[in-house]
Amino acid sequence: NQIDGKSAFYLYDTFGFPLELTVELAQEEGLTVDEEGFTQAMEQQKQKARDNQNFSAKLSSDSSLYEELDASITSEFVGYELLEMDEPTNPLDLERITALNDGSKWQKSLKEGEQGTLITAKTPFYATMGGQKGDFGTITTEKGRFEVQETVKLPGGRIGHIGRVTAGTLTEGETAALSVDTANRNNTCKNHTATHLLQEALREVLGDHVEQSGSYQDGERTRFDFSHGQAMTAEEIQKVEDIVNRKIEENLSVETKVMSLEEAKKTGAMALFGEKYGDT
């Protein structure tokens, strides 16, 4: 006779189904909803997110954790060519775990339930940078499975896969299969491209003074920060939406190219909001 709080929260968290609507529909069927249980599930999710965020921040900012690592331990991003490295037909397809950290010290292994960061010499996982949130997915060995909840750039140019062991044990030196959540990556890339479309549309409607002061993209949304002397009118917002949607409907091809900063500027690329760019 009652929809439990966890189920109600699952509808909200996974499908964006408001609690109020769940309650209303349940009442129509003579059911109730455990709203207290919903609130508890919500708080547990928030606490988990806070824990993961704090853990990620510690791993990515505490340079002392990496001073003892051998300088030969590096990471190469191969995610433009591969999203999975799990077929033993190519030298890039499988990688060895070169380092594991539990947030306080380097370990030889991590067991089920433990949080940590994994480093491999090559990875298809994109690390958070340039406003785009890093990939998540799985790293699997013969003896364990690791859920990658965040991917970050670490001191020394390394890429860290941060997450939790969900089954078995992962040990340094083991061969691992790396698999990016492709749906999330594709959605994130679409939202990143949409950010550029949005910027151009805003400049067309509001003027060339519009410059990006910040942005954020993940698999669910994009955010574009800019300065304008006044609030946009409903008509201006509609014009911007129409321009962006027309470009999306054109289904233009998107290419990824690596070039020098000078070459990029010649193609019309904009260096924005004091961003620190490297040579490529």
Predicted feature residues:
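A glycine- and charged-residue-rich anion-binding loop/surface
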Residues: 1-280
